[in-house]
Design a protein with these regions (language model features):
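Intrinsically disordered, glycine-rich low-complexity segments
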Residues: 2-8
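Phosphate-end processing signature that detects enzymes handling 5′-triphosphorylated RNA
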Residues: 36-252
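Short hydrophobic alpha-helical segments enriched in small aliphatic residues
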Residues: 15-17
Length: 252
């Protein structure tokens, strides 16, 4: 299960927070971005939530043919795209040891900072942009670095992903990724933009979690209904698969 959200609060700078919760290789990811003007009350939260559940592979060769029973209400293919990820750490593995994964995705700097949990149920804070990543790296390794020299880090993983995508039943996004080293993994995603306000009994974070659970349940029902389309199995993340081929003794 993956959750991405864009949260709006006053005039504060960009903030990305990630929550990973992955029973049966499900991941929850929440991205928060602040952009409302000063006049907006701080109690208002607008979140773009995306819930994603992984699967091992597609069970049919041509998903768009919609040949299973019951058939999708409708399905359309999206343009294929390529994602290039380069992951970094220092020679001592300080970032990974601290639960931080720094990468360039299609040339843009990102960092995932682990905030708790374990391999199957983890929480991460997601940072995006050169300056937030630079500060994150500096806080761990204790010295200044510049983007030109990759903040003093070396490459630990370099991989490309070809992503095929479809939209089914007008709202569920199905993606299937093929990495350049042969590993494959799929995801079903559901995205909604939701406005949250705190209530007497529930905080905004509690309301988000309740919404995430509801969205995840809808994905479970979707995948159960169209089980002919998916080989569920036990999905393996792309970095876990990559490091099996190029061991550094770590998993995402």
């Amino acid at each position: 299960m993956i959750v991405r959200g864009r949260e709006v609060v006053g005039t504060s700078p960009h903030l990305y927070v990630s929550l990973f919760s992955s029973p049966q290789s499900c991941i929850v990811l929440l991205f928060l971005t602040s952009f409302f003007p000063q006049t907006v009350m701080s109690a208002l939260r607008v979140a773009l939530l995306e819930v994603e559940r992984k699967f091992c592979s597609l069970a049919v060769k041509d998903l768009a043919s919609n040949s299973g029973q019951p058939a999708f209400k409708n399905i359309r293919a999206l343009a294929q795209k390529t994602i290039h990820d380069v992951y970094y750490d220092n020679s001592s593995g300080s970032l990974i040891s601290a639960g931080i994964w720094v990468r360039q995705r299609n040339g843009s700097w990102e960092a995932k900072v682990k905030r708790g949990g374990d391999y199957t149920n983890s929480m991460f804070e997601e940072l995006a942009g050169t300056e937030p990543v630079r500060r994150c790296v500096m806080d761990v390794i204790g010295k200044e670095g510049c983007e030109k020299d990759h903040f003093g880090l070396g490459t630990i993983a370099d991989l490309s992903t070809v992503r095929q995508s479809w939209i089914a039943d007008n709202e569920f996004k199905i993606v299937f990724d093929t990495m350049d080293f042969g590993h494959t993994v799929g995801e079903v995603e559901l995205q909604e933009e939701v406005q949250f306000t705190a209530t007497e009994n529930l905080s905004i974070e509690q309301r988000k979690r309740e919404k995430m659970k509801e969205m995840n349940k809808r994905i479970e029902m979707f995948m159960d209904r169209y089980s002919w389309a998916f080989h569920l199995g036990v999905p393996k993340g792309k970095l876990s698969a990559y490091f099996e081929l190029h061991p550094i003794g770590k998993k995402q």
